[in-house]
Amino acid sequence: LVDIAEAIINKRIESNEKKDDDLLGILLQMRDQISNEHIRDEVLTLILSGHETTANVMSWAFSYLAKNPQVRKQLEDEADNATWIKEGRTPTYLELEESSKVASAILQETMRLAPPVWVAPRIATTDCTIDGVKIPKGAHVLVSQYVTHRNPRFFPEPEKWQPDRWLDSNFEKSLPRGAYFPFGGGSRKCLGEYFALAEARLILLMVAKNFRLSGKFPKAQPRATYRPKGEVKNKVSLR
C-alpha cells in the first residue's frame, strides 16, 4: 500500500499538473509546509478509510439484497419514488436523507452483520476496571464491532439480516451506547461517517433504479477490514 501511495504521488508530481480541485493537488501545493511522508500518509488514509471500507460495505449490501428479493423490491420502490432521480439531478444532502429511509436501513443492517472495521484497537490512558476486569494504563484493548453487533440482548435474531428493524424510529433510540458502533465512537469516531453514508445511499438508489444484481453470497475474509473472500461476482440485468 505504501508503494501504491508513493506511485500515485510521484505520477502526479512528474506530470507537472497543477490541480487544486482534489485533495492530492492541494496537498502537493503545500510541499513547502508538509513533508512527502505526510502527503503519503494522507493518501494511505484515503485508500484505507475512504475507499476499501465503503467498497466492502457495498459488496456485502448488494450480496444481501440478491438473497432477499422482498427487501430489494422495497429499495427499488424507494428509488422509483425519489423526485431527484426522476428529475435527473443531484440531490441536496437533506433530500437524499429524506428519500433514502430503506437504503439507510439496508446500510445499517449490513454494517451490523458485516462491519467494515470489525475490531477497533484502543490504548487505556489510565488504570480502570470494566465489568470486574482490571485494565492497567497502557494496555492494548480490542473492541469488536463484529461480536458486539450480534448481541441478542439488543438485536433479536442477531444472525438474520433484517433491515426493517431500523425502520422503527424507536429501535435505534432504545440501543444503549456502544451496542452499535460501525464508525467507532467517542472523540476518535470516524470523521467520514456522513460522507460515507451519503455516498453509499446514492449508489444503492441509483443502482436499484436501473439494475438488478444476482449472484452467489460470498464467504468472509476478515483482514484489516471485514471483506468478502475473493471476487464478488454478480449477474447484472436491466430492470
Region spans (language model):
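A structural signal for well-ordered alpha-helical segments within the folded catalytic domains
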Residues: D3, N56, K101-A105, G178-F181, ...
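Hydrophobic, repeat-rich solenoid/adaptor surfaces of innate immune receptors and signaling proteins
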Residues: I8, F62, Q145, A200, ...
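Cytochrome P450 catalytic-core helices
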Residues: T53-E78, E193-N210
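Cytochrome P450 heme-thiolate "Cys pocket" and heme-binding signature region
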Residues: S49, R89-L94, V119, D131, ...
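Conserved cytochrome P450 catalytic core segment spanning the I/J/K helices
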Residues: L1-M58, R72, G88, S100
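Cytochrome P450 I-helix active-site segment
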Residues: E17-I26, Y64-V117, D131-A139, P156-Q162, ...
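Cytochrome P450 proximal C-terminal region
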Residues: D80-W84, K189-R239
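Conserved cytochrome P450 K-helix/beta-meander segment immediately N-terminal to the heme-binding cysteine loop
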Residues: G25, V143-E172
